[in-house]
Amino acid sequence: MMIPPEGYRAKGYKVWTVGDDIAWMRKGPDGRLYAINPENGFFGVAPGTNMKSNPNALISTQKGAIFTNVARNLDDNTVWWESLDKNPPVNAEEWKGAKVNGPEYIAAGNKLAHPNSRFTAPTANCPCLSSEFENPQGVPVSAIVFGGRRPDTVPLVYQSRSWNNGVFIGSITGSETTAAAAGAVGVVRRDPMAMLPFCGYNMGDYFKHWIEMGEMLGDKAPKIFNVNWFRVDEDGHFIWPGFGDNLRVLEWILK
């Protein structure tokens, strides 16, 4: 759902969305790796989503969407969450169901929406949906990008030396925990390929499957990279601007 920076848009760059979460990948007739999106919607964290950070995601929620654990404006029956805008509803129902004065509630150190509140929106709502979304053959995969949330140590982007080295890089992924994970927030947790909560079998067997994929694809295997958008400076501010500017890194990866 990325929107290219202004300079890229002036050059004619466009970004089309096939999926934002799950990719099912298989070898195509030409020997390359292809991927489809098995889902028919988008599932995202609400807090922090706004018209500046992810306008296409927000536009996708305008109809037929499901919101969980967000706040509700009781005056007009609309939803609200932190960073949606700077105008929390005065007559609000916070995520646990209590009726509160939104600005006063926030000023007291509370959250109107749960930090891990979510939205689920139909794929058809996406203004940048790729024309290849319904293609049963999928789309060719040019690169595989792993990444974790690390405030230090890990650079913005680097490339693996080989497919197997890329599998190793994915296997040692670590990420600082957020409200989406159980337990303490802000602790670096080992999360191989960001799949720890989702892999239903032994991780060693999972890595073996990846290595076998590389053997099957041979010299047509996509290159593997690792990114870290979340490095911070000594004052705790993000060094990289993120969002649409991530296209600068993706351009380097693809070229």
Specify the residue positions occupied by each region the protein language model found:
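Conserved NTP phosphate-binding and transfer environment spanning the P-loop NTPase/kinase superfamily
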Residues: 47-50, 55-255
